[in-house]
Amino acid sequence: MSGPRAGFYRQELNKTVWEVPQRLQGLRPVGSGAYGSVCSAYDARLRQKVAVKKLSRPFQSLIHARRTYRELRLLKHLKHENVIGLLDVFTPATSIEDFSEVYLVTTLMGADLNNIVKCQALSDEHVQFLVYQLLRGLKYIHSAGIIHRDLKPSNVAVNEDCELRILDFGLARQADEEMTGYVATRWYRAPEIMLNWMHYNQTVDIWSVGCIMAELLQGKALFPGSDYIDQLKRIMEVVGTPSPEVLAKISSEHARTYIQSLPPMPQKDLSSIFRGANPLAIDLLGRMLVLDSDQRVSAAEALAHAYFSQYHDPEDEPEAEPYDESVEAKERTLEEWKELTYQEVLSFKPPEPPKPPGSLEIEQ
């Protein structure tokens, strides 16, 4: 094995060799998942702490290669304060022939909403600020034509100033794509995805926001189902059984027959579940946790709800450029995905590092 690339160094962490630029110092493992492992580090160029994700076997198969390309392109496309941003992407390879590793550098966030809910009871002001930011990020993502599909507390990062960013777009898919059944952690999953009822739309993410908001308000999950059937039962105990109009929209005959076999349940008054909560919070929840996805509020509509009157500013809730999915919708070979990914790595322009304090702008 030859030595590290010029300007890079190697370090073994959790039985994995990392090869990173010398400006990334003090690598410390912070977690790992199916798609890669993450270290925190100090970036001497950006003068800030960052998260470095090493993708695991990015080109192991056609599916891996397409997912790698997609994740990189999505991260490059999305630039918003409430969405995790790409600070850098690199590979130790110096040619396409050696290209087998991809590292993504993003903002380091301290905690996720899971940690926050476990550690402290949140005030109504906290909940307002967190859910406002979540919806602000979601409005931006949705305006690009992207559905996240996997929103849950562990995918929502928060720093010590209560600033929030949405993470993990590995599973996000374009809005007009054929939809399949198995993606998010079940408790936060909209019923139409969970049971493969019908083609779904961006409001699946709004259902997830409703579940997250409910958890922030009461300190525990709203629908902690033990399996699909239990999950559906818990949902219907709160929102009631679907009306004939909603049933008619369910394309799965199996799901329709099953729901019709259940005893009818009335919709519960949410204020009886969230005792003492701000009535505006309860009103907003009631607009998000709606079985009929056509009747759920959009992210943009939710931002204008009176619950966020302290924060809502239509001039400061930006939208994204549309995301062009045609490139990744095509059938390609593994080598072609790899080549496209390599081009995306090479064409990335990192953000400008901060100017040292006291430095003067010099006119060229």
Curated annotation (Swiss-Prot):
The modification Phosphotyrosine is found at residues 182, 323. The active site is at residue 150. It is an enzyme of class 2 (transferase). Signal peptide: none annotated. Its main location: cytoplasm. One of its GO terms (biological process) is stress-activated protein kinase signaling cascade. Dually phosphorylated on Thr-180 and Tyr-182 by MAP2K3/MKK3, MAP2K4/MKK4 and MAP2K6/MKK6, which activates the enzyme. It is found in: Cytoplasm; Nucleus. Highest levels in the brain and heart. Also expressed in the placenta, lung, liver, skeletal muscle, kidney and pancreas. Pfam families: Pkinase. Activated by phosphorylation on threonine and tyrosine by MAP2K3/MKK3, MAP2K4/MKK4 and MAP2K6/MKK6. MAP2K3/MKK3 and MAP2K6/MKK6 are both essential for the activation of MAPK11 induced by environmental stress. HDAC3 interacts directly and selectively with MAPK11 to repress ATF2 transcriptional activity, and regulate TNF gene expression in LPS-stimulated cells. Inhibited by SB203580 and pyridinyl-imidazole related compounds. SUPFAM superfamilies: Protein kinase-like (PK-like). Nilotinib binds at residue 71. Residues 311-331, 343-364 are annotated as: Disordered. Gene3D superfamilies: Phosphorylase Kinase, domain 1, Transferase(Phosphotransferase) domain 1. Its EC number is 2.7.11.24. The TXY motif contains the threonine and tyrosine residues whose phosphorylation activates the MAP kinases. Interacts with HDAC3 and DUSP16. Belongs to the protein kinase superfamily. CMGC Ser/Thr protein kinase family. MAP kinase subfamily. This is Mitogen-activated protein kinase 11. It comes from Homo sapiens. The lineage of its organism: Eukaryota, Metazoa, Chordata, Craniata, Vertebrata.
